[in-house]
Amino acid sequence: MFEQRVNSDVLTVATVNSQDQVTQKPLRDSVKQALKNYFAQLNGQDVNDLYELVLAEVEQPLLDMVMQYTRGNQTRAALMMGINRGTLRKKLKKYGMN
């Protein structure tokens, strides 16, 4: 029998290694690796608005998946995300998801 455990405190990413084994690692590790790669590509150049760039990269797919999960129910989506429904509507509009 398979057992699925959900830890609401840690988001994980499933990865497949060269031996086709699936492993789970915290999402923050993937974000950290993506940022390391990004900084390596900058080659010492300065960057502006990094916070907004990273936030947009995470926020848009988060909104998309939550809206899919709630079947478009904005009240339920806002509750899941812990934000006000008006804030959710603004964010959806920002990304053209309204």
UniProtKB/Swiss-Prot annotation:
Species of origin: Photorhabdus laumondii subsp. laumondii (strain DSM 15139 / CIP 105565 / TT01)
A Gene Ontology molecular function term of the record: sequence-specific DNA binding
Family classification: Belongs to the transcriptional regulatory Fis family.
Record's keyword annotation contains Transcription regulation: yes
Biological role: Activates ribosomal RNA transcription. Plays a direct role in upstream activation of rRNA promoters.
Residues forming coiled coils: none
Keyword DNA-binding: yes
Family annotation (InterPro entries): Fis_DNA-bd (IPR005412), Homeodomain-like_sf (IPR009057), HTH_Fis (IPR002197), Trans_regulatory_Fis (IPR050207)
NCBIfam families in alphabetical order: PRK00430.1 (NF001659)
Domain of life: Bacteria
Complexes and interactors: Homodimer.
SUPFAM superfamilies attached to this UniProt entry: Homeodomain-like
The protein, known as: DNA-binding protein Fis
Signal sequence, start to end: none
Keywords tagged on the record: Activator, DNA-binding, Transcription, Transcription regulation
